[in-house]
Amino acid sequence: MFEHETVLKMESIEGLNIKPDGVYVDCTLGGAGHSEEIAKRLTTGQLYAFDQDDVALAHAKERLAPYEGRVTFIKSNFVHLKEELAQRGVTKVDGVLFDLGVSSPQLDEAERGFSYNYDAPLDMRMDRSRDFSAYHVVNEWSFGELARIFFTYGEEKFSKQIARKIEQARADKPIETTFELVDLIKEAIPAPARRKGGHPAKRTFQAIRIAVNDELNVFDRAVQDAIDLLAVNGRICVITFHSLEDRICKQVFKERSQHPPLPPGLPVIPKEFEPELKLITRKPIVASEGELEDNRRSRSAKLRVAEKQK
């Protein structure tokens, strides 16, 4: 069963400022919680919903059946946002939503290899039509590359110890399953550190997932494209779940909400010198106490919202 608790649902819908006749894009369809809220607010408007996962798409089509005609499903990664919409004759939109949490069903489907809680082949591909998987990262990347991604993408302070342990183990035979990898991570991390801060494999698994799916580069490009696509007064809402994604979002929003250099002595700022984006949220919106109690995964969620000005 495809269960997925939607995070910051009403806050992000409010952030989009939906018009009944507007054009909206959900870049991360997942369990369709956000898409359902957008679709029910549309009359003559249209929602374009992206996901590269067949299971998520099948479930979402069922859930959004009451809104048939208002929703177009697109099986693609959001890095192809501009091209996919252009193929459908869409060049401007009124709102774009990103929810960067891996949907719980993908985490919980043992055979997908995302989770350190289930034994499964090392996989972690969001798009299963691609060949490159967690197996290739773990068994083929050099000690230096592994240590770098564990530290940079996972913020893992024992990155070198874990990379060294993997390098030693795979010299005997390939590392094939999630539990084999979990055991190596546990061996590499000193016992006192293993006992605090959640599951010892959490950061390493996050880093490998980001590397397999090239998540940070893909996200950076997609946010830039989404801002390009926005019509004047259109909104972009981004929900992130760790500091790396939030940093990218914050930086892109900051760059595109700054004034170009102004000629000295102007009494008023001419239209052409106004920044492209206006920040709706100076600080990110976080989950309420009630949501934190209902959904543990919301505790690291941050929502940022910006509006196109020109």
Swiss-Prot record:
S-adenosyl-L-methionine binds at residues 32-34, 51, 78, 99, 106. The lineage of its organism: Bacteria, Bacillati, Bacillota, Bacilli, Bacillales. It is found in: Cytoplasm. One of its GO terms (cellular component) is cytoplasm. Its EC number is 2.1.1.199. InterPro entries: RsmH, SAM-dep_MeTrfase_MraW_recog, SAM-dependent_MTases_sf. This is Ribosomal RNA small subunit methyltransferase H. Keywords: Cytoplasm, Methyltransferase, rRNA processing, S-adenosyl-L-methionine, Transferase. Its main location: cytoplasm. Pfam families: Methyltransf_5. GO terms for biological process: rRNA base methylation. Residues 290-310 are annotated as: Disordered. It catalyses: cytidine(1402) in 16S rRNA + S-adenosyl-L-methionine = N(4)-methylcytidine(1402) in 16S rRNA + S-adenosyl-L-homocysteine + H(+). The keyword Transferase applies. Specifically methylates the N4 position of cytidine in position 1402 (C1402) of 16S rRNA. The gene is rsmH. The keyword Zinc-finger does not apply. Belongs to the methyltransferase superfamily. RsmH family. It comes from Exiguobacterium sp. (strain ATCC BAA-1283 / AT1b). One of its GO terms (molecular function) is rRNA (cytosine-N4-)-methyltransferase activity.
